[in-house]
Amino acid sequence: NPVFNEIYQKISNDKETVGVEYQSKLDGDSLLKLLSFNKKRDVFLQRTSVGIHKDDLLFTLEENPLKKYASQGQRKSFLLAIKLAQFTFLKNCLGINPILLLDDIFDKLDPYRVQSLINHLITNFRGQIFISDTHNHRIPGMLSDLGVSHLHKEIIDGKWKK
């Protein structure tokens, strides 16, 4: 998806390439043929052993499987890029800006990736964005430095701090 790739590139500062590949287990055979071939086995097992439910998505980083080769920060960047691509898709389909919730974005991301993410959001997203953080002044400081209008609220023991 070009939108996903573009977002990931911005978060990673064009340092890494990513991909998503659909992997079918049908191996060129028709679904009907595979279901017929496996019918006795499936009845015995009481489950369907072939079909699109066995297909998968392979996520890659620099053409290597993301699960095996990516750091936690790269995995979180990948996940954020997918979420932001979904946001863009919904915005384009519905014609409205969905509310975006980013929970603890500093967890697993280095400050450069967070800065790139915030810059991307400022440039490309309109609407309400809720960002949570475990450090009280980190996000407000970053947003203030960028001249971004924001409302900062602190919750202590489950209650808004006044």
Q: Predicted segment positions?
A:
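Walker B catalytic acidic pair
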Residues: D103-I105
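Conserved NTPase motor "head" modules and their coupling/switch loops across ABC/AAA+ ATPases, GTPases
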Residues: N1-I99, K108, Y112, S116-Q128, ...
